[in-house]
Amino acid sequence: MKAKATTRQGRRRFLQVSGVATAALMIEGLPFTARAANSGKIKIGIVGSGRVGGGIGSVWVKAGHEVMFSSRHIEHDKALAAKLGANAHAGTPREAAAFGEVVMISVPYGALPEVGKNLEALIKDKIVIDTCNPFVWRDGEIATWARKKGAGLASVELLPGARIVRAFNAIGAARMSTAHQDPGRIGMPIASDDAEAIVVASNLISDIGYDPILIGDLEMGKYLMPGTPLSGEHTPEEIRKIVATLD
């Protein structure tokens, strides 16, 4: 009986989420959304240009977006930008945060407090794609806290003022920039409380070959990390079925 009740609750949550997604994708008159739709190009600042940030950012450049890469190793970022061409740039994390209409943060979770403090004024009111996952073995106590609180809600506290979308969290880093090339569509589960941010992030995800699937608000972001039912590569329909079972 309890299992059936949980399933019904999950289905109700999924129907609510589906309604939010539909409403979000029908939004009109939002200045940034309209501008992005008209030009087809967005300036993206990437903070953390490792396997996820560097890989996804490279695919965005190839899709026609203008991207600035940043990390602790500027020479790495300069070499990456030079290889990608005129739409790719290298800078410091602060320069990337200032450059981007959208900012993607892809750093170890243990670095988020420092990143949030250093970039707070630059990412305030900006759409921030949060790819960071808390691993206790790597990030220590802050990962324990984030996993207990839920990674989405924890990131809100660590990146105050940002309009957060959790995405690119469930698929392994080694496959992140290539999984979309395989036959069949792969879904990309996302979570956010911000309707406009959902639209913009969904378009960027679609641009690189994934199907964006909104699973809910940032509280549901706790499921967007390795080790949860949503981890790994799933079709859009598989993601929807999994979400319907979550409580």
PLM region descriptions:
Residues 132-165, 174:
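Rossmann-fold NAD(P)-binding glycine/threonine-rich loop
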Residues 85-87, 92-127, 134-138:
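Rossmann-like NAD(P)-binding element
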